[in-house]
Amino acid sequence: GPGVSLMQEFIGLAYFAEIPAVLFDVQRGSPSTGMPTKTQQADLLSAAYASHGDTKHPLLFPEDPTECFEMGALAFDLADRLQTPVFVMLELDTGMQDWLTAPFRWDDARALDRGKVMGAEELEAGRDFGRYLDVDGDGIPYRTLPGTHPRRGAFFTRGTSKDRYARYTEEGPAYVDNMQRLLRKFETAKSL
């Protein structure tokens, strides 16, 4: 609901800095405080294009608590794989009512999809690491996780324009390159 409106700037930061995030949006009648006890699909455009500028976000639409559970797990995989915010869009009835369901089953052997993560071995071998470098042409760069390597793979991320190596720049070609890469990422998301 209105909480998505209040989070727009931070959603844009997560999108542009490519920080995985999952947001569950229980929609109600809007605008403003609207009708807080009535269901409505009022946040679709707000979530799809959350923040200013050229942002797009994957949206998942569960219809019952079981799908909420399943799509919740999928949302975390997609957020990591695409390195972007993912929304799980619920209607008020689904999110706020009491439901009788079969027990949810979690498979402890299920592998998490962390996406493109560069390990210490690759860094040690001298593989070129640029936090926003699109090696595979799908718009999704490789990332490292904190503590991967004592001297390589660290990066400083920001919400401002940057080049492929996460260095601040306002040069037009670097900005255009980054925005085109982000659009390729969204095209990749359509095929997942």
In which residue ranges do the predicted regions lie?
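Thiamine diphosphate
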Residues: 1-49, 58-79
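Short acidic, glycine-rich surface-loop motifs adjacent to enzyme active sites
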Residues: 55
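A broad, low-specificity signal for short, low-complexity segments enriched in glycine/proline
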Residues: 17-23, 46-51, 156, 164-173
